[in-house]
């Protein structure tokens, strides 16, 4: 918390609703954004749209965590529609295991697709059985609560393989 507040002492001069609107990223979630927003309010006496990724109690959006991942799949569905097809039964490669990737995977599963891969900066996992809802819940807990590495998935699900230092784009899939 103290780091976020100290950071805002300098950053406040460079941001604003009409200037630049920072957002969370790797290692910076709603909690940290909340700390920074609180300090911004204290320094400026404003409650304006200066940060994205705030909690609901600070004026954040209800579906902010899901939005980008869901829209990825909405866009994909529109592309598939032009080819006269949809996601049902299609094998999908996903790069990443953070917020956007997690909710992309969730939406793919909801629409009948089969998620085959997820990754982090160390490597990727490929699950020949697919990453179902239960396995995705494990990944979400692993990444969001325990701050674990995707490699741990392969320890939990022995049929999955972990490939260190690589991206998943060379695995066979439909998407």
Feature-to-residue mapping (PLM):
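Glycine-rich phosphate/diphosphate-binding loop of Rossmann-like nucleotide-binding domains
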Residues: 52-55, 60-169
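Glycine/serine-rich phosphate-binding loop and adjoining beta1-alpha1 elements at the start
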Residues: 1-88
């Amino acid at each position: 918390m103290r780091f976020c507040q100290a950071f805002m002492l300098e950053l406040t001069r460079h941001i604003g609703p009409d200037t630049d609107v920072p957002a969370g990223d790797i290692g910076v979630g709603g909690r940290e954004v909340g700390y920074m927003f609180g300090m911004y309010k204290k320094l400026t006496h404003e409650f304006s749209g200066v940060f994205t990724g705030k909690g609901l109690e600070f004026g954040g959006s209800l579906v902010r965590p899901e939005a980008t991942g869901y829209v990825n799949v909405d866009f994909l569905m529109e592309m598939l529609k032009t080819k006269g097809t949809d996601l049902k039964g299609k094998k999908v490669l996903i790069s990443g295991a953070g917020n956007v990737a997690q909710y992309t995977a969730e939406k793919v599963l909801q629409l009948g697709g089969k998620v085959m891969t997820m990754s982090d900066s160390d490597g990727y996992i490929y699950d020949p059985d697919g990453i179902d809802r239960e396995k995705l819940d494990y990944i979400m807990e692993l990444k969001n609560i325990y701050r674990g590495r995707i490699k741990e998935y392969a320890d939990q699900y022995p049929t999955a393989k972990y490939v260190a230092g690589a991206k998943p784009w060379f695995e066979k899939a439909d998407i």
